[in-house]
Amino acid sequence: SLDPTILDILYKNKKIDLSKLYQYSGFLGLTGSSDLLKITEKSKNRSNENEKLAIDLYCYQVQKAVGSAISQIKGVDLIVFTGGIGTGSSLIRKKICAQFDYLNLKLDHKKNKYHLTGIISDRYSKVKVALVHIDEMQEILKVCQNFI
């Protein structure tokens, strides 16, 4: 996130169009792509600091959200990864889960690697981790049909 005063300074001093700032910030501004799955795939084959930063920032934001939820519900038994990034990137899952090792959350690295639906945590992990593939568009369609 940005300090709100930065936007005013950029506009007044640098004449930066704020709509362009929003359009070209985030993953796109860091890496030239807004597709995190493509960024993670490209980062496997090369060492690009901006790609690494984008991945780390994404994982940090997810870790903050999950950590906050865990503290509010006073514990966790299961973390489920779904959606494009959740099911498509073993690297993202590994990085996110690493932050929660203090909860005795341990991934089974072989299961995590193959992106198969089911439990991907180590059998001795206190907190289980699951991978669930869904057709997001089909799920959205089901919800929308309830309103028609």
Predicted regions and their residues:
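Generic structural signal for well-ordered, non-membrane alpha-helical segments
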Residues: 3-4, 14, 51, 55-59, ...
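Glycine-rich phosphate-binding loops at beta-strand->alpha-helix junctions
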Residues: 77-100
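Glycine-rich phosphate-binding/hydrolytic loop that grips phosphoryl groups
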Residues: 111-148
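A conserved active-site cap/scaffold subdomain adjacent to cofactor or substrate pockets
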Residues: 1-23
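Adenine-nucleotide phosphate-binding core of ATP-dependent small-molecule kinases
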Residues: 19, 23-73
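Gly/Ser/Thr-rich active-site loops/lids in small-molecule metabolic enzymes
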Residues: 1-8, 95-107
